[in-house]
């Protein structure tokens, strides 16, 4: 099962670590990694040109919002109503089981669950919770 909607990973300065991309590669889930022009070649060497989208701007000083908006517009231009958007620093996926957070390797199931709920509820934004353990 491949996701019904495109997956984007926004990234800057992490062409070597590529944590989220590696997680998705392990389970053969297709994605695009979205980067600024000055890092495009570095990401292409790491991931292959077919996976890398080059932003039409660089160093705007506005955080990740312009890149997120680019992904939204890119997905809409391809005819998608929804898309997945991930940061580039996800090491693991987890879910709550009996009140405890457990590592979850069934990422495809999680994507399918979100897709089904988006289609069923017709909400504009639906996604995953970020959890950082300190």
What are these regions (language model features)?
Residues 7-11, 29-37, 126-127:
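Short, hydrophobic beta-strand segments that form beta-sheet elements in well-ordered domains
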Residues 20-24, 44, 72, 111-115:
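Short amphipathic alpha-helical segments and helix-helix/interface helices
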Residues 25-32, 47-53, 113-124:
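Structural alpha-beta junctions
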Residues 35-86, 91-104:
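Active-site-proximal specificity loops/subdomain of glycosyltransferases
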Residues 93-134:
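Conserved catalytic core of nucleotide-sugar-dependent glycosyltransferases
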């Amino acid at each position: 099962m491949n996701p019904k909607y495109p997956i984007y990973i926004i990234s800057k300065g992490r062409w070597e670590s590529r944590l989220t991309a590696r997680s998705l590669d392990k389970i053969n889930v297709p994605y695009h990694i979205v980067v600024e022009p000055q890092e495009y070649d570095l990401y292409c060497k790491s991931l292959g040109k077919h996976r890398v989208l080059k932003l039409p701007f660089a160093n705007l000083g506005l955080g990740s919002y312009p890149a997120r908006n680019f992904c939204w517009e890119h997905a809409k231009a391809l005819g998608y109503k929804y898309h997945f958007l991930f940061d580039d620093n996800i090491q693991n996926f987890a879910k709550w089981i009996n009140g405890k957070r457990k590592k979850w390797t069934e990422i495809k199931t999680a994507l399918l669950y979100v897709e089904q709920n988006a289609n069923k509820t017709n909400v504009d934004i639906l996604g995953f919770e970020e959890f950082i353990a300190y």
